[in-house]
Amino acid sequence: MGKKTVGVKKRLAKAYKQNRRAPVWITVKTKRSVFGSPKRRHWRRSKLKV
């Protein structure tokens, strides 16, 4: 187990921020045609290539 480099840490932070659900106002605005975010990622099912 080594230290994370700054580049890897920034990429992990970006992936962490992207891994959110779609905002509720989008669901309301599109009359529930948009439910989730296509970029959602589960920590166990699909791994990042960092």
UniProtKB/Swiss-Prot annotation:
Pfam annotation, one family: Ribosomal_L39
GO cellular component, one term: ribonucleoprotein complex
The entry's keywords: Ribonucleoprotein, Ribosomal protein
InterPro entries found in the cross-reference section: Ribosomal_eL39, Ribosomal_eL39_CS, Ribosomal_eL39_dom_sf
GO MF entry, a single one: structural constituent of ribosome
PROSITE patterns recorded: RIBOSOMAL_L39E (PS00051)
Record-level GO BP terms: translation
Family: Belongs to the eukaryotic ribosomal protein eL39 family.
Protein name: Large ribosomal subunit protein eL39
